[in-house]
């Protein structure tokens, strides 16, 4: 294991105490969820694409609080559907993760780079 410098014990059993209140918060905002788009997003909990079901999406979001993130499964699921994988934001951490499973990931680290990259696609 690698010790990470984090602000809270995310994705561990220590987060179980907030699962019930978090479920309540998600239920309060459930009307703003567009579950038809859920199958376009991978779940950190399952490592697969979400189902178009409000109960499943909320269950996955709550479960990810106290369970390990399934990075490799997420990356493989994303790569299986994508013609090209892009990482948008500062730094290039995902590029290296994808490289470990043999997938090329183009990093887009600034606004001008994003404009150039996505103008081509």
Feature roles, as predicted:
Residues 1-121:
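Acyl-group transfer acyltransferase/transacylase scaffold of fatty acid/polyketide systems
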